Regions:
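Bacterial Sec-dependent N-terminal signal peptides
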Residues: 1-25
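Function-determining sites in protein domains
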Residues: 20-233
Length: 233
């Protein structure tokens, strides 16, 4: 078999969310982990109709959800890393040599449950319906993109076409959900370009308004919500 050698150029390494027009589908068949269960239990309150879960690489997890009973947006943030706490409880460090240790999964033992803080801001039914409509269309349009290709030379001088893998170095995970459907994107915490970038930016502004208990700032986002819905539609 002939070896293929090539140089990975920095231009090939892209943050996937940049100029992204669609969210990515979430695998419904994927096994639910202890971490997934704790994210739901700690960050998705009862009576949640739709929402978003934010999973940063170097900060603590949070969520923005809509409570259909309270007619309010709820922002919930963990006071420590849920991922770190669940990993600590479900793994143990095992010696594999004189100076080599490896993490091995185990049954849940001692678990230090993360704390959470919750903020609530009532919104109009009009805004709730607009957000619901936006969430639904954005999630329903989730799709995997076509991979980009480039030409490269093998060691014997032949030119071949290879697929460029999109690589995300850490970043923030954003997962949107509505009535059992979920879609996600991995990128940074500043939104980005394209429709998905605008959706992230809107989510951040809504989150800030709830955290600051600023009804006026939240209401001012109505036109932005309607405009973004038209873009997705």
């Amino acid at each position: 078999m002939k070896k293929l050698s090539f140089i990975l150029l920095l231009s090939f390494i892209g943050i996937y969310m940049n100029a992204q027009e669609h969210l990515l589908p979430v695998d419904k068949k994927a096994k639910e982990t202890f971490y997934d269960k704790e994210i739901k239990r700690l960050l998705i309150p009862d009576d949640t109709e739709f929402g978003m879960i934010c999973k940063p690489s170097f900060e603590f997890e949070s969520s923005l959800t809509y409570d259909s009973e309270a007619h309010a947006l709820i922002y919930t943030e963990a006071d420590t890393s849920i991922w770190s706490r669940t990993f600590e409880a479900s793994h143990r460090l095992e010696r594999k040599g004189e100076s080599v240790f490896m993490w091995k999964s185990q049954q849940i033992t001692f678990y230090r449950v993360p704390g959470t803080k919750m903020y609530m801001l009532p919104i109009s039914d009009e805004m709730a319906q607009s957000l619901k409509r936006l969430w639904k269309v954005a999630i329903n349009q989730a799709e995997f993109p076509e991979k980009e290709r480039t030409k490269m030379k093998t060691e014997d001088g032949k030119v071949i076409t290879v697929e460029i893998e999109e690589i995300v170095l850490d970043g923030t995970g954003w997962e949107y959900f509505f009535k059992g459907k979920r879609a996600k994107i991995q990128g940074d915490d500043k939104g980005g370009k394209g429709k998905v970038g605008s959706l992230i930016n809107l989510t951040i502004e809504l989150r800030n308004a709830v955290r600051e208990n600023d009804s006026q700032k939240c209401a001012a986002l109505q036109s932005q919500i309607d405009s973004l819905y038209k873009e997705f539609k």
